[in-house]
């Protein structure tokens, strides 16, 4: 009769068991998804003072969330910021058009101003042109009386 030798077995200890944690089986993507879904706020104050005289006090508030969660909370400043939205190109083009219109209007104004100055200079050189209209009309009326 053959017998198989019996080997002593090791008693099981707690070192073989895995301690469950809240991040067990979670990848970085899972953690980010949870944080962005719920949102997280980090707040802090920085104060610099010398001899109980406060020089600088900075309050920092940081909100990390998904775009959808931020919209739910009423935060959507990036939608109206021309540097962060697709409207920026349209605003640049509109700005260029307005600059061109402004330059055109300034050129027209300069031309009109110089023309008005020239006209004033010409009329100042010819005093006959400065006679009031009623004097011219009264002289014409005098001639008609002489003819009759």
From Swiss-Prot:
One of its GO terms (cellular component) is gas vesicle. Keywords: Gas vesicle. InterPro entries: Gas-vesicle_GvpA-like, GvpA, GvpA-like_CS. It is found in: Gas vesicle. Residues 136-148 have a biased composition (Polar residues). GO terms for molecular function: structural molecule activity. Its main location: other. Residues 1-21, 118-148 are annotated as: Disordered. It comes from the Bacteria. A minor component of the gas vesicle, might be involved in nucleating gas vesicle formation. Gas vesicles (GV) are hollow, gas filled proteinaceous nanostructures. During planktonic growth they allow positioning of the organism at a favorable depth for light or nutrient acquisition. Interacts with GvpA. Belongs to the gas vesicle GvpA family. This is Gas vesicle protein J. It comes from Nostoc sp. (strain PCC 7120 / SAG 25.82 / UTEX 2576).
